[in-house]
């Protein structure tokens, strides 16, 4: 059986920009992407903690060290600058792969700096 499992999460990032007139996507600081192993053009699910919106888009790599989290195109209608968001990717894994799967979670501060990296095999952490 194949199951869809959370693979990476950027937890409590703050939206730094919103650009309605761009063709789409979310731009994320490349340092953050590398920390959680999210690739450019990878599909992401986004949850807005401020208004409850949930949506999907794809990733564009942003300038390193910028802390940039910019929603582009139609997705920009679902956020305001300063909103707290959770950005996730998922992987489809078989039962054997699941046994060794450890999602990467980057916990962010209010300046979009990683303050903690979590590599857990079991979902035992409450944030």
UniProtKB/Swiss-Prot annotation:
Gene transcribed to yield this protein: panD
GO cellular component assignments: cytosol
Stretch forming the signal peptide: none
Protein function: Catalyzes the pyruvoyl-dependent decarboxylation of aspartate to produce beta-alanine.
Post-translational modification: Is synthesized initially as an inactive proenzyme, which is activated by self-cleavage at a specific serine bond to produce a beta-subunit with a hydroxyl group at its C-terminus and an alpha-subunit with a pyruvoyl group at its N-terminus.
Top EC category: lyase
Family: Belongs to the PanD family.
Gene Ontology biological process: alanine biosynthetic process; pantothenate biosynthetic process
UniProt name for this protein: Aspartate 1-decarboxylase
Gene Ontology molecular function: aspartate 1-decarboxylase activity
Keyword Cytoplasm applies: yes
Assembly with partners or alone: Heterooctamer of four alpha and four beta subunits.
Cofactor binding, note field: Binds 1 pyruvoyl group covalently per subunit.
Pathway membership: Cofactor biosynthesis; (R)-pantothenate biosynthesis; beta-alanine from L-aspartate: step 1/1
Protein residues bound to substrate: 57, 73-75
